[in-house]
C-alpha cells in the first residue's frame, strides 16, 4: 500500500493492518557498507533493523569451494557457512544459522521491554534464541514440542530469564505455534513474530550479504534449504537491496530452494 513509518513499536504488519504484504525495511544507508568496527554479525548493521548490538554473535562465513566444486565440475562455487567452525572463524555456538535471526531480532527497537517475548520452535530457533536471550538477559518464553526436547541443548546453563513450556508428547511444531498464540493473548507476553518480523528476515539475509562481500557481485544462482520458505524471502529482499545499490550487478539471482517432504 506504500505506507511508511518509523520502526519503534515492534511492528509485525502494516499499521493499516490490511494484511496485504510483509513489512520491508528501507535503510538510511542505501549502499552496502561493512562495519568492521562492530563485532560478529553486526558488521552488517547498516542493513539490519537494530538499535543496539549484543554480545556473542558470529557472522556468516563465505569461502570459495575446492573439494565440492571439483566433485561437481564447477570453477566458481562459493559456500556460505552458518554454524560453528572455528578454523574458518565461524563461531555460532548453537551450530545453527538461527543465531543470525536471534541476534537481529533481539537488537531491534522494542516497545515491549517490560514484557516477555514468546518464540515457538521445533528446535533450532529455540536453541538460538535461548542462547542469545540468556547471555543478554532478555526475558523469553520458548514453546517447543516435547518430542523435540533433545534438540534443545547449550554449552552452559541458561539464565533464569529464559523459560520453556512444551506441547505434550505426540504434538508437533504447529501445536507449539498454537500454544504460543494462546500465551500471547495474555497480558505480559508478546510474539516474536516469525516471518512477519523484519529483523528475523534481515538477520537471515546476512547470508547473502556475506556472499556478496566475498564474491564481489550478486551470485547467478543461490542454493538454500528452507522450512517455511522465510529464508528464500530474506535472500530475495537482500538481492533487491544490492540491485538498488548498483555496484554489485542489476540481476536477480536464481533462487534454488530445497525442502523436506513433510513441509
Model segments located where?
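PLP-dependent amino-acid enzyme catalytic core
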Residues: 1-263
Amino acid at each position: 500500500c506504500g505506507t511508511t513509518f518509523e520502526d519503534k513499536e515492534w511492528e509485525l504488519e502494516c499499521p493499516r493492518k490490511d494484511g496485504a504484504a510483509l513489512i520491508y525495511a528501507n535503510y538510511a544507508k542505501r549502499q552496502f557498507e561493512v562495519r568492521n568496527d562492530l563485532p560478529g554479525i553486526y558488521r552488517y548493521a547498516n542493513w539490519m533493523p537494530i538499535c543496539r548490538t549484543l554480545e556473542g554473535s558470529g557472522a556468516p562465513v563465505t569461502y570459495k569451494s575446492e573439494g565440492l566444486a571439483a566433485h561437481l565440475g564447477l570453477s566458481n562455487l562459493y559456500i556460505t557457512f552458518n554454524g560453528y567452525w572455528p578454523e574458518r572463524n565461524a563461531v555460532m555456538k548453537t551450530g545453527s544459522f538461527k543465531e543470525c535471526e536471534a541476534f537481529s531480532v533481539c537488537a531491534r527497537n522494542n516497545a515491549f521491554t517490560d514484557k516477555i517475548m514468546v518464540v515457538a520452535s521445533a528446535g533450532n530457533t529455540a536453541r538460538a534464541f535461548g542462547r542469545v536471550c540468556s547471555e543478554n538477559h532478555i526475558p523469553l518464553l520458548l514453546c517447543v514440542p516435547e518430542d523435540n526436547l533433545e534438540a534443545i541443548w547449550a554449552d552452559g546453563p541458561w539464565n533464569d530469564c529464559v523459560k520453556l513450556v512444551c506441547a505434550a508428547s505426540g504434538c508437533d511444531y504447529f501445536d507449539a505455534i498454537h500454544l504460543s498464540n494462546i500465551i500471547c493473548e495474555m497480558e505480559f507476553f508478546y510474539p516474536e513474530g516469525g516471518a512477519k518480523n523484519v529483523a528475523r528476515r534481515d538477520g537471515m539475509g546476512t547470508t547473502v550479504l556475506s556472499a556478496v562481500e566475498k564474491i564481489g557481485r550478486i551470485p547467478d544462482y543461490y542454493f538454500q534449504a528452507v522450512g517455511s520458505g522465510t529464508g528464500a524471502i530474506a535472500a530475495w529482499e537482500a538481492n533487491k537491496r544490492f540491485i538498488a545499490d548498483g555496484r554489485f550487478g542489476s540481476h536477480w539471482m536464481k533462487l534454488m530452494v530445497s525442502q523436506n517432504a513433510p513441509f
